[in-house]
Structure formats: C-alpha cells, structure tokens
Curated annotation (Swiss-Prot):
It comes from Enterobacter sp. (strain 638). Belongs to the malic enzymes family. NAD(+) binds at R157, D270, N418. Its cofactor is Mg(2+); Mn(2+). Keywords: Metal-binding, NAD, Oxidoreductase. This is NAD-dependent malic enzyme. Pfam families: malic, Malic_M.
C-alpha cells in the first residue's frame, strides 16, 4: 500500500458518543463531519458548524495568546493534548519556535515543580514501588498495543532542579511531545513512564497535595531490582520498543545505561543525546572557522555523567579526525566542584577515570593552588572551547571569560545547564565580555543579543535536534540497539545542516522551521549506520527512505467508519 493511500484511508472505530469525545488520540471535536456525527452518535453533542483543523488551530492560537505567563500557556497546551492530540500537534507545528520552550525547557521545569498542584488528567503510567509485584498487570493496563517509544524517569534529577518525585513525569510527557512534533513519531506509539520510588524532597513529602508515594527514596539493591522488574516487563509486553532513560541521578544514570544498552534498544538522552548534539554543534563551529574539532582544546565545567558523556563523544570524533586516543584525551580538561580531575584525585567515579589529566604534566602550570580551579585551568590551558554542564548559575565569571578571550580570538562558549535559571553565564554577558567575538550556544532558549548595534543570534544546543531523528531512524530501520556509531552519525548529519557551514553566515544550528528536514536526515543516517553495524536488517537506501516516509506522522484528521468491538 503506498504512503498516500495508507495515510488517507478510513479508520474503523468501535467507540461512539461521549466515549469517543473523551479519547484524545481519536477526538476531532468540531471537525467531525456530518456523516461521522450521525454514525457515531454525536448529533447534538457538538456545535453545528463543522470546522477544519486549521480553523480549530486558529481559535486555539487566539486563546493561547490570552494567557500571560508561560506556566499558564503550558497548562493550556497540556489540556489540548489531553483532549485532542491531533489538534495539539497541529497547533505546535504551526508555532513550533514559540511553543517548544513552553511544552519543554525551560517551562517544563516549573510544571514539574508544581505537578501535583496543576494536575488535571492522567497521562502515561505511574509505577510505584508499593505496586512492584503488579508490574506486568500495570503495563497490560496500557490500552495502546503498539508502543514503539517509551521515555522513563524516576524523577530524581529533573533538569537542574533535583528531586521532584512523580513531578518528574512532566519530562517524559514533554520529551515525547517533541518526538512527535520534531520527529514525526505518531503519539499512538509513545508512552511516558515515571518510576515512583519515593522522594527525598522534604517539601514534597510534607505537601498535602503531593500525589506520589510518601516515602524516602528506595536505594541500592531494592532500587535496581525494581528497575530490572520494569525492564523485564517492558520486554515482555513490547520487545521491540525503544526505551529512553531520562533525568536519572548521576549515581544511577550510567550504571543503568551500561547494564541495559545491550539488552534492550535503549539510550540515555542526558548522556548520549546531549553528547551527540554538542558534538554536532562543535563539529559545525569548527568547520565554519575553517578548522577541525581535533585542533581545539576543550574545558568542561561539570564532570557528571552528562559532561563526561559529551567529552567521550568529542574524543571519539577527534579520533575519527586522526588523533590518537592519548592525544585526544590530553586535549580535554574536566573541572568539577573539587577542581580539575587529575590522576591524583581520590574517589573518582568509574566514568571519570579515563578523563583525568596526569598531575605530572601540570607541574609547569602558572599556579600555586593545590586544587586547580576553573580559572587556573583556563589560564594555563588557553582553551578554544568552554562547555558548562554544572547546573549552577553564574560560574562562568567575567574574569574567566575575559581570560579565555585573551588567548582565543573567537572562543566558543556553551553554557548548557537547564533551565535558564541554572545557566553558567548569560549570552548577553559572554558577548559583552568578549567584545562580540564569542560564538555562543546555550542549553535553554535565549533571545538574540544586541551589542553595539549588531545582532548576535544565540543557538540553542537542544537535544531535540537529535533524539527525534534517532527515534525515527530506529523505528524505520527496526534497529535492535543504539550504537555509539549511530550517535556519531547523528552528530555528523546535524553538522552538515548547519547554516553557518553551508552559507558562511547565520546560526551554527538549523532553524526550528527546518527541524523535520533535519530529523529525516538524521533518521536516514542512523538507520543506515544501524544496518552497517548489523543491528538492523539491510535494505536498499530507497527502502529505508520509504520506511522513514511511511512512519512520519503528520497532524491531520483521518476519516472514520464505525465498527463493533
């Protein structure tokens, strides 16, 4: 069946009347045709006029503009999503640049903090530790049989906001909204999940409105057994699903990824997605400057799982460009709250050990400090690139940025911490402190900076450039695993779509209006690499492209015909 026929054929629906209107995936509201209203017992349940989806979207846009705060806009959009998903995605598609920061970062942070307060209607699956023995039954309660993408969190490290308990559910919901809005994955194929293992947030534990399990967090063997029970139940119900780990605490994120990435098709977006989009941004920025990433010296502030994941991706890329592993690692410097990571530092985490600098190689540094601060590192390394993943605001001080600029004419500065309140430095300050010479990319959206009558666009190094395309590529190719090479192919493809690289001007990352083009291209690259790696069945390029096209969902109403259950 060709793509056009498949996407325009009628759907046979067993629901009718108010039940149909309460089904978000199927509800059309005022767009039900006269024939459908008669067939599905909807006569008199809707206003007389039959509207198009564009007319509905225009009304929703007018209503949206009436809300003054970002959190109220978020609540409004979530209400549409929970009543008419097709309309929700048409509205978001029409206003993606305006609405992406509202449905996801930074506004989703406030929505997570206030989750129990603003709760309206259930979405997704809440699995509490108290119900751990009912795991299979819980997943059987999900009405969608063909789930292809799950985003799961335990709510312990939500953005830079810490432990939000079940309030962390806002992240999987928002993330999956972007899988659909940016990557064309049908909402019928997606499932947000929160693992409710308690919370150590005392404010939540004493909040009478808090809807989660009121208990300190389960840890150690009990925690890992609970997660394993969930993974096994998922494999039993949906063996081919793509599982994305989201906002797990540092102590659990990497162990869970390493444990399950070869058991189920899975990845951690905080570690691997952030690494892929950052690497793609840096590849593009280096090429735009007529250079290569392998020529750059890079300093990180933040040596957690996300920062180390980015560093490892960069090291892999520079090895592809010709560096030895030893030389590649010698050009990357990791700084955390205890200073520069060195081989003399005790109590390093396993994923940090390969990213240390040899203390012996630092003996000629211009400093008497035993603990080497970020300023010490910048002064002695003279980096070309400074990346912030600390989750702490204001740590890129004027002194540090000006010191960097002394030795680098066009510094690349990337304060990536989310949400906006946690950013290491604002783009405005960085532009001023570098006399307009810095290339700035941030984790959260920022308006362009105007300095000395010149406009400086600020690229958002947003994972949504990467993970929707990866998801689409996995679904289209039928990949059983996500390999490092698949992630690197996504980074390379993103860099190839940089306006700054292609045109010599503009943003280092594509505009959001081109996100579907980018996601399709990444999906093809990821699917092709999956085939080369032997984790997907080999097909022709044309067949892979056809599979991508067939799986790319657009927010358009289908005609309905009634059938019995």
């Amino acid at each position: 069946m060709d793509k056009k026929t498949k996407k325009h054929r009628s759907l046979y629906i067993p629901y009718a009347g108010p039940v149909l209107l309460e089904f978000p995936l199927l509800n059309k509201g005022s767009a039900f045709s006269a024939e459908e209203r008669s067939s599905f017992n909807l006569l008199g349940l809707l206003p007389e006029v039959v509207e198009t989806i564009e007319e509905q979207a225009e009304r929703a846009w007018i209503q949206y503009q009436g809300f003054k705060t970002e959190i109220d806009k978020h609540i409004y959009l979530r209400n549409i999503q929970d009543t008419n998903e097709t309309l929700f995605y048409r509205l978001v598609q029409n206003h993606l640049e305006e609405m992406m920061p509202v449905i996801y970062t930074p506004t989703v942070g406030a929505a997570c903090e206030r989750f129990s307060e603003i709760y309206r209607r259930s979405r997704g699956v809440f699995i509490s530790y108290e119900n751990r023995h009912n795991m299979d039954d819980i997943l059987q309660n999900v009405p969608n049989h063909n789930i292809k993408v799950i985003v799961v969190t335990d709510g312990e490290r939500i953005l830079g906001l810490g432990d939000q308990g079940i309030g962390g559910m806002g992240i999987p919901i928002g993330k999956l909204s972007l899988y659909t809005a940016c990557g064309g994955i049908s909402p019928a194929y997606t499932l947000p999940v929160v693992l409710d293992v308690g919370t150590n947030n005392q404010q939540l534990l004493t909040d009478p409105l808090y809807m989660g399990w009121r208990h300190p967090r389960v840890t150690d063997d009990e925690y890992y057994q609970f997660v394993d029970d969930f993974i096994q139940a998922v494999k039993h119900r949906w063996p081919d699903v793509l599982l994305q780990f989201e906002d797990f605490a540092q102590k659990n994120a990497m162990p869970l990824l390493n444990r399950y990435r070869d058991e189920i098709c899975s990845f951690n977006d905080d570690i691997q997605g952030t690494a892929a989009v950052t690497a793609g941004t840096l590849i593009a920025a280096s090429r735009a400057a007529g250079s290569q990433l392998s020529y750059q010296k890079i300093v990180f502030l933040g040596a957690g799982s996300a920062g180390c994941g980015i560093a490892e991706q960069i090291i892999a890329q520079t090895q592809r460009e010709g560096l030895s592993e030893e030389l590649a690692r010698s050009r990357v410097f990791m700084v955390d709250r205890f200073g520069l990571l060195t081989d003399a530092m005790p109590n390093l985490l396993p994923f940090q050990t390969k990213l240390v600098q040899k203390r012996e190689n630092l003996k000629n540094w211009d400093t008497d400090n035993e603990v080497l601060s970020l300023l010490d590192v910048v002064r002695n390394v003279k980096p070309d690139i400074l990346i912030g993943v600390s989750g702490q605001t204001g740590l890129f001080t004027e002194e540090i940025i000006r010191e960097m600029h002394k030795h680098c004419e066009r510094p690349i500065v990337m304060p990536l911490s989310n949400p906006t309140s946690r950013v290491e430095a604002t783009p405005q300050d960085i532009i001023v402190w570098t006399e307009g010479n810095a290339l700035v990319a941030t984790g959260s959206p920022f308006d362009p900076v105007i300095w000395k009558d010149k406009v400086y666009p600020i690229a958002q190094c947003n994972n949504s450039y990467i993970f929707p395309g990866i998801g689409l590529g996995v679904i289209a190719s039928g990949a059983s695993r996500i390999t490092d090479e698949m992630l690197m192919s996504a980074s390379e493809t993103l860099a190839q779509h940089s306006p700054l690289v292609k045109n010599g001007e503009g943003l280092v990352l594509p505009e959001l209006k081109d996100i579907h083009i980018v996601s399709r291209a990444i999906a093809f690259a990821v699917g092709k690499m999956a085939q080369q790696q032997g984790v997907a069945v080999k097909t022709s390029a044309d067949a892979l492209q056809q599979a991508i096209d067939e799986n790319f969902w657009m927010p358009e109403y289908r005609s309905y015909r009634r059938t019995s259950i």
